[in-house]
Amino acid sequence: MQEQYLPSEIEAKVQQHWQDTKTFEVTEDESKEKFYCLSMFPYPSGRLHMGHVRNYTIGDVVARYQRLQGKNVLQPIGWDSFGLPAENAAINNKTAPAPWTYENIDYMKNQLKMLGFGYDWSREIATCTPEYYRWEQWFFTKLYEKGLVYKKTASVNWCPNDETVLANEQVQDGCCWRCDTQVVQKEIPQWFIKITDYAEELLNDIDQLDEWPEQVKTMQRNWIGRSEGIEMTFQVEGSDQSFDIYTTRPDTVMGVTYVAIAAGHPLAQQAAENNPVLAEFIEECKNADTTEAAMAAMEKKGVDTGLKAIHPLTGKLVPIWAANFVLMNYGTGAVMSVPGHDQRDYEFATKYGLPIVGVIKPADGELDISEEAYTEKGILFNSGDSFPELDGLDFQAAFDAIDAKLSSEGKGKRQVNYRLRDWGVSRQRYWGAPIPMVTLADGTVMPTPEDQLPVILPEDVVMDGIQSPIKADKEWAKTQVNGQEAFRETDTFDTFMESSWYYARYCSPKADQMLDPAKANYWLPVDQYIGGIEHACMHLLYFRFFHKLLRDIGLVNSDEPAKRLLTQGMVLADAFYYTDDKGARVWVSPNDAKVTETDDKGRIVKAVDSQGHELVYTGMSKMSKSKNNGIDPQEMVDKYGADTVRLFMMFASPPELTLEWQESSVEGAHRFIKRLWKLAHDHVSQGPTVALNVASLDSAQKELRRELHKTIAKVGDDIERRQMFNTAIASVMELMNRLQKAPMESEQDRALMQEALCAVVRLLYPIIPHTSFELWQALGHEETIENVLWPVVDESALVEDSKLIIVQVNGKLRAKVTVAADADKDTVEAAGMAEEGVIKHTEGKTVRKVIYVPGKLLNIVAN
């Protein structure tokens, strides 16, 4: 064993061994318990960042730990390789997205190998390959045949100058990123999958996800948004037209003083034909930002359509207003407005001089709506002559009474609604999987026949930054179906499609079908899934939805795709900037910032860069290109080794919390590995050891062995049950401190050190696998560490021969005594009373009572 710890040599050697022996390639084996560990696969952007490294290190630690439990462990990797960044890079670099993507995959693959992640590379997938998206296209056609796919018009960002659709990321301050033209909203036909058909199951099955974070489950419940209410019909005065409104607060219906409809509602469009003010308002609404955040912040505006609605219970007329806070694609596109009991309605009514009527009062007081709406549930009053029996009812009683009345008159019905909308999967981009639908010459729309799949995306293209190459190339869309001329769909799939089923494809990545059911059902569900909480409501919901679709088509037999979910926190780093001559912020890398002053708590006060600019320190923030505060993993591995980077990542913070990057702490992790290496080297250099004779150990040796086996138990529990990897590492570090001070004089001292080091190396193997691999060999083992089991706790070693008892007099500490572990109260009392500190404080006093807490405390009450 070499004396010096040389990570670059060790890691290259061990990684070559793993590659040569295909250590992490696995097949189905019914005789072994399986464990499927999966980290969310990366987008091949060009280089790994520290967020990737944290995610994949956590996954690798879990996978390697489970391997040492004797399980058949699958840990695959691949590339989420379609998407807009590749198009933008292709435009900037005057190339096609495909070569840029494949070059990035090659580079990042080498980075992943450099970090020592134990992936089964034989299962590698890239979602941009026809071998992958062929089966996504096939699956879509099956969903269409089952009635789960439909086409309807939906709003998109449209650049009138370039005549092209823009992704949200390409809209900057309301303008096109390329030509700065004002972006407008345009309705175009798009494909949707009926996720709403599964809304109830998706919601109810959240209760099965016992090992998912509560925060993620709450976010999904809120996103699905189940509500119980009443849908009621309002007639339009002087017309046979009507419209429906859904409300979860039917108890307030007697307080409706106006109705608000979306600018895109047919009634608003119709009224605008003779109302230029309304027509102008509708045009203004077309170009509004309709994201939730924007809707919440925007000024609430509206225009009276001139139409009146007939209240379904009172028969009174209420005005119909077009309002910018109602969306046509949400609910029915119309809401009943009760300003007395809804704050938004209150502010709108106040602004436009509309009546405000109170019909709900607190159960224990008077109603006051002079300054704001009363929005709580309470007791109904002021219900009027048309339905006086509502007065005095509480919410539920009123709900039932109003439901009964509307149902009997055919004007409404009780209904369960969901906030969740169907999934629009069309994207007017090039770099995505073509949607496998065709339109025949006679206008018939149908799926691409199975024998024509995959519909291959041409990769040899030129990106002009304006139009998708497959939209620009009219010949590409032309095809033949059943002897007829047909035209292919030129939209591509939302890239969430690819990431919704990749986990299942890993089970049989080379199968000539979407999934091999036998293999999929061996590996699925995923036992441990790891990724960021930012995916809670999109990817993780589609991921669950697709699994249910796969189940219902007969490809898998489980209800949920993943048993356990860990959402790792972000990686933060110091961020610095200076302001240039034009007043713009120039962000400076932490590597180029020299701290010149700190306060008494060590916080940065002043810093300069290498060119002398005085820097503003903004604190720790998420590593990002925009703030130039990313740390290149390659640099850190070159400087300290992969094991050091991995150890720091796992030790610096609990996995679900943010991790603050501090190079001084990285250096600390490196020093710890060097200490371990030195301890092992010093031990090995003294030659072979004799067998450990537990029966002959003295008390100090027994105590050290007890600490060893306590540590084995704690580390296993911390990794498997608690997933507190940082405390597991801290326990090993504490044990290491004990081992470094342990005597090495006798044969049994060295035999005990051999047992301890063999255990420590296995405890650390999931975290620092290269170092552990090498040390395991150095400790005299022929079999490689991947093929051995996690150390077993010797329960007999945990049994203590003696106990330390705290001795108090009148509740104050006066002595500590060591007694036999099985000592009774009388023995402990005698030992305690003999202590000098106890004698001093009981002398001349009468002992009134002796309280003994077995194995812990003796309290003598004397006065």
Curated annotation (Swiss-Prot):
Keywords: Aminoacyl-tRNA synthetase, ATP-binding, Cytoplasm, Ligase, Nucleotide-binding, Protein biosynthesis. Its EC number is 6.1.1.4. One of its GO terms (molecular function) is leucine-tRNA ligase activity. ATP binds at residue 625. It is found in: Cytoplasm. One of its GO terms (cellular component) is cytosol. InterPro entries: aa-tRNA-synth_I_CS, aa-tRNA-synth_Ia, Leu-tRNA-ligase, Leu_tRNA-synth_edit, M/V/L/I-tRNA-synth_anticd-bd, Methionyl/Leucyl_tRNA_Synth, Rossmann-like_a/b/a_fold, tRNAsynth_Ia_anticodon-bd. A motif ('KMSKS' region) lies at residues 622-626. It is an enzyme of class 6 (ligase). A motif ('HIGH' region) lies at residues 42-52. PROSITE patterns: AA_TRNA_LIGASE_I (PS00178). It catalyses: tRNA(Leu) + L-leucine + ATP = L-leucyl-tRNA(Leu) + AMP + diphosphate. GO terms for biological process: leucyl-tRNA aminoacylation. HAMAP family: Leu_tRNA_synth_B (MF_00049_B). Belongs to the class-I aminoacyl-tRNA synthetase family. This is Leucine--tRNA ligase. It comes from Shewanella loihica (strain ATCC BAA-1088 / PV-4).
